[in-house]
Amino acid sequence: MPKHDRLHRPGVIATRAAVHPATQARLAAKRYRFPALATMPRPIPSGLISGSNRIYRSAPRRGDEIAEALAGILCRGGGSVLITSSRRTHAAGLALLREQLGGFSTASLDGSGENLYFAYLGLADTVLVAGDYVAMVSEAAGTGKPVPILNLDGGNAKFARFHVAMRAAGITRPFCGRIEGWSDPVPDDTKRVGAALHLFALGRRKRA
């Protein structure tokens, strides 16, 4: 259970990030499975874009700012961009993003065909993530790459606790309009929870 939920109960394992399947082994296996992606010009920032929910609001201006920032990154340093949207991403905003990035080497997930999400994470040099999605932030952190956070309007105390903890650990930073390189410590929450559950299962077998 993530610490920011503050559900302290016997038998509950507290984690900083969400438990997720974006392991280093899975990302490595997916990384070069798709030749067309593997040959895209580098550097490759990947943008994980969501949308409005009951806590956060993704205003149209934020879509413009994200597209402008990504285009600026490509203009200054070249490379490619990989875009992942969610079910909450506004279709108009996503279309605008694609239009503004149309002159660059881009690829985006639209929910059709094979899911390339883990390939995108594995190939990215930097993973920009919308701050309203704990799971996406946690999966991006599993890459060990820099994870700048795209701030949205809104939020609450629970999300604030999560982001403060991730920044304090050196895992994420606020996105400031440019790509910064830093050493991103990979959270060990998934391994730690898996090991604890394994020990618990072994204990039950011995008592049976």
Task: Label each PLM-derived region with a short phrase.
Residues 1-62, 175-187, 191:
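A nucleotide-sugar donor-handling region in carbohydrate enzymes
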Residues 55-56, 89-95, 155-158:
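Short, charged/polar "capping" segments at the starts of alpha-helices
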Residues 78-111:
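Catalytic donor nucleotide-activated moiety binding site of glycosyltransferases and closely related
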Residues 117-159:
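A donor-sugar binding/catalytic signature common to diverse glycosyltransferases
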Residues 156-208:
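C-terminal amphipathic helix plus adjacent low-complexity
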Residues 62-77:
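Short hydrophobic signal-anchor/transmembrane segments that target glycosyltransferases
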Residues 110-118:
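Conserved active-site histidine-acidic residue motif and adjacent donor-binding/catalytic loop
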